[in-house]
Amino acid sequence: MSIKQMPGRVLISLLLSVTGLLSGCASHNENASLLAKKQAQNISQNLPIKSAGYTLVLAQSSGTTVKMTIISEAGTQTTQTPDAFLTSYQRQMCADPTVKLMLTEGINYSITINDTRTGNQYQRKLDRTTCGIVKA
């Protein structure tokens, strides 16, 4: 499961254009909120995305945060625990050029796994710090 299923160059070009257009007439926070909304919409267009017994089913924005909801597939044996899956997914996202661009623009990610087998919920937050990106 990877955000790179989206056409990255097209998305980056679009987002850079939007960033350029909005930077003159909107505050940084408003700009980041609009980018988060667009990023959530772009992810949503590719849903559901399945990987390792988990399915990304929802992406929505709240302010400058892109919230993503993943569920464990009912009746399917997962190959990783939810925590291990989140760690792996975080590593993939932090390496993705589109995600890196979003993080440098002030976008954060909140990833939640709802484990349908146990009823437990697992959450991970991604920002510049968790992905090791220093502010320029």
Swiss-Prot record:
Disulfide bonds join 94-131. The keyword Lipoprotein applies. One of its GO terms (cellular component) is cell outer membrane. Part of a type II secretion system (T2SS, formerly general secretion pathway, GSP) for the export of folded proteins across the outer membrane. Required for correct assembly of the type II secretion system-beta (T2SS-beta), for localization of GspD-beta to the cell outer membrane and for export of a labile enterotoxin by T2SS-beta. Each AspS2 binds to 2 GspD2 subunits and may clamp the monomers together, stabilizing structure and accelerating its assembly. Encoded in a type II secretion system (T2SS-beta); this strain encodes 2 T2SS but only this one (beta) is expressed under standard laboratory conditions. Cryo-electron microscopy shows that the complex forms a cylindrical channel with 15 GspD2 subunits, each of which interacts with its surrounding AspS2 (GspS-beta). This is Pilotin AspS 2. It comes from Escherichia coli O78:H11 (strain H10407 / ETEC). The lineage of its organism: Bacteria, Pseudomonadati, Pseudomonadota, Gammaproteobacteria, Enterobacterales. The gene is gspS2.
